[in-house]
């Protein structure tokens, strides 16, 4: 029997995430909305391209706020049948209330009443400091949900690194399975790790300094790491099927930064084969103008999103000189 699940991800990546969900075995997508997807699955999902995943206990029509959602739960007991009772005995839980992607406070009198009902019917007990289970009352424009959160947030990120769920989407867009892939200007581990997990046959990381090269050498095995300029590498002409470039969005915009990106784009044209794919992740302020002016690359798709509070995008491009319209994501 397929259970109903709800997963969140970075808003702006709806199309690639939906395509990735549809490629998962045993998954039936019901709805994809900004920053989230509702789907059924025969097994508990563990997908690297989403941020948080929940089991859906109850769906409600849109409400004005979390207090209205909690009151509606109190007046309807149908959701009690959805609890996984084999997992509830002795578990500690807390209730989390949220509007969209922001946590908000609810009327504690209503929350206490909801906690009491759950304790009486499931064998769980409240423990707000260090719970085993989080039950979310989530209000969104399309619906209100009562959710059982599964596992922990999968999208870890260290300072200066991309979130792991974004990196997994980039790996999918690069179509790197069983292919030669190069990361130009590689300064973090999360991106090459996602490309390697995506099935890259041979992965080359060109790092701007020794510290970045040493970091990647210590974290990833089976990856060729070299130090040098992104605009001048020893990678053979036409030997790569994908090239990925990430410009840290909080870096200061300088003439040198623009020059480095321009040189890296020219280098990508040299090392990519005729069907190669070029992916750039950067803030609009850093890259939009340079990408628009660069000759010899053709835009396949652009996904606008927010990274580290900055308006950014993922550009998917090709060096293939053709006017024939291509489908980025094969259905």
Each predicted region: which residue ranges?
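Short, solvent-exposed coil/turn linker segments
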Residues: 78-84, 127, 202, 229-230
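Active-site phosphate-binding and catalytic loops of NTP-dependent enzymes
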Residues: 120-133
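A short alpha->loop->secondary-structure connector
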Residues: 117, 124, 153
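Non-catalytic nucleic-acid substrate-recognition regions in nucleic-acid-modifying enzymes
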Residues: 1-121
């Amino acid at each position: 029997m397929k259970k109903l699940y709800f997963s969140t991800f970075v808003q702006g990546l709806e199309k690639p995430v939906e395509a990735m969900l549809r490629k998962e075995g045993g998954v039936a997508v019901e709805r994809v909305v900004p920053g989230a997807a509702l789907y059924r699955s025969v097994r508990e999902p563990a997908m690297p391209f989403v941020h948080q995943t929940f089991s859906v206990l109850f769906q409600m029509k849109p409400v004005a706020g979390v207090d209205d959602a909690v009151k509606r739960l109190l007046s309807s007991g149908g959701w009690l049948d959805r609890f996984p009772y084999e997992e509830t005995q002795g578990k500690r839980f807390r209730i989390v209330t949220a509007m969209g992607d922001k946590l908000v406070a609810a009327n504690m009198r209503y929350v206490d009443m909801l906690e009491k009902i759950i304790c009486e019917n499931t064998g769980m007990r409240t423990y707000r400091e260090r719970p085993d289970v989080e039950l979310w009352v989530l209000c969104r424009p399309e619906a209100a949900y009562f959710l059982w959160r599964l596992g922990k947030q999968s999208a870890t990120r260290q300072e200066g690194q991309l979130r792991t769920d974004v990196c997994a989407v980039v790996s999918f867009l690069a179509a790197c399975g069983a292919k030669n892939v190069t990361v130009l200007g590689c300064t973090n581990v999360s991106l090459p790790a996602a490309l390697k997990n995506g099935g890259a046959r041979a992965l080359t990381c060109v790092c701007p300094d020794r510290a970045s090269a040493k970091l990647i050498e210590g974290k990833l095995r089976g990856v060729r790491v070299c130090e040098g300029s992104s605009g001048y590498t020893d990678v053979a002409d036409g030997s790569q099927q994908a090239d990925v470039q990430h410009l840290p969005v909080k870096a200061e915009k300088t003439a040198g930064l623009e020059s480095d990106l321009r040189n890296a784009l020219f280098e990508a044209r040299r090392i990519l084969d005729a069907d190669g794919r070029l992916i750039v992740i950067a803030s609009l302020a850093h890259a939009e103008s340079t990408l628009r002016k660069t000759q010899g690359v053709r835009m396949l798709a652009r996904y606008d999103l927010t990274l580290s509070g900055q308006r950014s995008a993922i550009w998917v491009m090709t060096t293939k000189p053709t006017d024939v319209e291509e489908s980025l994501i094969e259905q």
